[in-house]
């Protein structure tokens, strides 16, 4: 970048850099440079292919994966609990969270594990003792943290969505090619579930075919329903809470309780709304195995209670996919907002529930849930007919759940189930939906 001689001097391969900068200097340059500046014109990696500063450590099955966690409260605490079940495979090496209010904080139950407010300081001081990173932060922080982790050769488990906009999703796909030995798993945990494998087998068997319409919905109440904010609220942060790190170089907004503790999902600038939160759990099998991770050719939106700052009170987003791969054109409709369910299929009475999907196949309709739950045909008669004819494939049992799958992949036992190659196109679909919710129209 003009005016930054360190960055200008650093625009070179790591081998060349070693002549001018120590590896430690390079480490600091990577950590304290926003990724968008690293890859932009004049940036650290503007000239093409990137290699990690450190190669990922080879971890044998009899060795534990030394894991740091960024974002340890709220969802982070739940994820820690899930990984802790596999104590024979994981060792928690460090924790980082802007909400560690005391300089020498510790996490209950993990006394002795170093804690940091700033994840960059954690990497700077402990990168040699870390093999993998769990990222359970607000959506806007996922991308820079994933990039920094990958450039340091650390395997990554990152909560969904993988990133918050289309540019970030596409750059991470490049990163996956540049850093092929770095394992990344997006945390749509149902992608390792039984229902996902079942849907895959139904597609392979030709059971799900000639689909022309898919409806998906999440119509539970959300945090922002009923909000009427037309400006960012303002309050004083708790003493010790590092608001600057939380913002992650986004334009300054004042601290408010309406931005933290999960409320960030409500705001365009920091979250991805209901679609980013639940779409990854409802659409993952459909997008991966029927739509073949394709992106839509056209998007239209109908909004209920639109806002300039927060997600609408409800929406219907229609993604149109052209005919491809020998399959007809498909219309995927996403519904959110209280009571904003799709119409029920012909002959179906009663409430569809607040979460689910309907896949309109050639001869029947398939009902899905979320988080890797099992699919079923709405017609019991058709189900019996297919089962009696031996045309209803058996559902494979997953060899591991999503969390252990990540640890297994780090140890070379099995491939990861939701790598960037799968997760980024899904995240991009969700981000495109969020763009539609923000701006409306087609």
Language-model features: locations:
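Conserved acidic residues
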Residues: 93, 131, 212
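N-terminal secretory signal peptides and thylakoid transit peptides that target proteins
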Residues: 13-34
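C-terminal helical cap and adjacent loop that interface with cofactors, partners, or active-site loops
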Residues: 30-39, 52, 78, 254-259, ...
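Beta-strand-loop-alpha-helix segment that lines the small-molecule cofactor/substrate pocket
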Residues: 138-139, 143-191, 206
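A structured beta-alpha segment of the ubiquitous adenosine-cofactor-binding alpha/beta core
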Residues: 114-130, 135
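N-terminal Rossmann-like dinucleotide-binding module
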Residues: 33-110, 286
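Predominantly a Rossmann-like dinucleotide-binding segment in NAD(P)-dependent oxidoreductases
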Residues: 71, 75-76, 178-185, 190-300, ...
């Amino acid at each position: 970048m003009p005016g930054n001689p360190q960055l200008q001097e650093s625009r070179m391969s790591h081998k060349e850099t070693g002549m001018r900068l120590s590896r430690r200097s390079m480490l600091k340059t990577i950590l304290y440079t926003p990724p968008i500046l690293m890859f932009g014109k004049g940036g650290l990696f503007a000239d093409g292919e990137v290699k990690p500063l450190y190669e990922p450590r080879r971890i044998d099955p009899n060795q534990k994966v030394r894991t740091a966690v960024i974002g340890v409260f709220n969802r982070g605490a739940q994820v820690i609990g899930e990984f802790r079940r596999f104590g024979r495979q994981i060792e928690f090496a460090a924790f980082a969270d802007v909400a560690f209010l005391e300089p020498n904080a510790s996490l209950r139950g993990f006394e002795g594990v170093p804690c940091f407010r700033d994840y960059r300081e954690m990497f700077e001081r402990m990168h040699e003792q870390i093999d993998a990173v769990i990222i359970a932060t607000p959506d806007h922080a996922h991308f820079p943290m994933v990039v920094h982790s990958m450039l340091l050769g650390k395997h990554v488990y990152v909560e969904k969505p993988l990133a918050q906009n289309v540019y970030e999703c596409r750059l991470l796909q490049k990163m996956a090619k540049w850093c092929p030995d770095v394992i990344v798993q997006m945390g749509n945990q149902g992608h390792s579930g039984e229902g996902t494998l079942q849907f895959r087998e139904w597609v392979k068997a030709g059971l799900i075919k000639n689909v022309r319409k898919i409806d998906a919905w999440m119509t539970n109440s959300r945090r922002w329903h009923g909000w009427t904010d037309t400006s960012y609220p303002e309050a004083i942060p708790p003493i010790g809470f590092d608001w600057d790190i939380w913002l992650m170089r986004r334009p300054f907004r004042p601290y408010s309780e309406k931005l933290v503790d999960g409320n960030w999902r409500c705001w365009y600038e920091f979250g991805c709304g209901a679609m980013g939160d639940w779409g990854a759990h409802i659409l993952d099998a459909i997008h991966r195995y029927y739509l073949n991770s394709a992106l839509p050719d056209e998007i239209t939106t109908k909004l209920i209670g639109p806002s300039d700052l927060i997600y609408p009170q409800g929406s219907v987003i229609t993604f149109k996919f052209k005919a491809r791969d020998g399959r007809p054109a498909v219309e995927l409709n996403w519904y959110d907002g209280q009571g904003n369910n799709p119409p029920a299929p012909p002959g179906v009475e009663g409430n569809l529930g607040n979460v689910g999907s309907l896949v309109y196949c050639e001869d029947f309709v398939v009902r899905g849930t979320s988080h890797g739950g099992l699919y079923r045909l709405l017609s019991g008669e058709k189900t019996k007919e297919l089962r009696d004819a031996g045309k209803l494939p058996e559902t494979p049992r997953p060899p591991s759940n999503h969390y252990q799958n990540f640890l297994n992949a780090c140890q070379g036992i099995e491939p990861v189930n939701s790598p960037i190659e799968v997760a980024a196109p899904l995240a991009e679909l969700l981000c495109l939906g969020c763009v539609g919710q923000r701006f409306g129209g087609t």
